[in-house]
């Protein structure tokens, strides 16, 4: 067996289930299989291998489901791919082969079943990896922050429950106005290179990783900048996104037989860790830019989000939106929620009128990090917070956001019932960074770190 050419990536992980993405390699006309075997840390004997047949339709990649795991337990696993001599093998018959597994042993931990135990998360976005003629130039620049994240994840308590990558995991357009990538094979190559750099590979092989797309997975400011010829680009970019980012997410349903459904109804999804729940929105591909019904989330998604906000018993509710919910930018804000004020106000009024507590909006996009509190002039019980974490690695062509980037001296929205007012609760971080969140009974601690892992600032968001 050979090491995966991309991965393994630990995706959606629960108390008893984990998803592992990996890619092999095309072998002319020969069959190719990928496999995973695992054991509890400290045990001697490996499980039987779980195998999947790889096909060119999925770029020789797939996701393997591990089921009936024990909660809050550390597992070791091995992963690899091979091409058997016989052309008639199946995923059942290859289990009997005397395979020599790759030496690398990876680890992951299942989620705790304790409802109120403290949880920790990593949040980041916008990882620029410069490509020239299909070859990464100075790839270590786009990878080094992941060494710092992996180092933190290995030594911190409570253990990291998940890494949230909230958009622009790759730059399909590469900030290239003259000749951006449009072909499917070019976009696939970008994913392979971006996700196989050593430090991000190490992090994703051991920490459950959840992703959602933003514009650069397609093109800058999509769909506002869409041209008549961009349907071809969109089809290719989305097909690659579905393989490399959505495939291991909860957007794919787990079937009763323990397999992952191939069907993908939408890109938005939910997941839960004890009394903490996440609703990861697709704020990019379901937009409606028409004047009579402008919306950043389609109607089905908005209804699902409001239903979840109102009825979920979760103590803490994180809403991920790849673009900023608030505060608004003074310029270049039309790609974010600023340009969709009616829908934003509907969400805020839902939270306020139903008296929903501990709602946190999490986003990236702006190449600056901050926390901010939103209050209401006539309703002292209303409070919402936002956590922004961006970028993991900036391009030298793009500026970092500063406090002066944002509109902070006027209400976010004015209504007959009162004004929504916001204020920064942190400094604005204007450098490459990531956020380490720790959620306990009393508060959410937001720790921003620079690309070398050094602490930049800590903010405590009180919980009701």
Pin down the residues of each PLM region.
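Metal-dependent phosphoester/phosphodiester hydrolase catalytic core
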Residues: 1-464
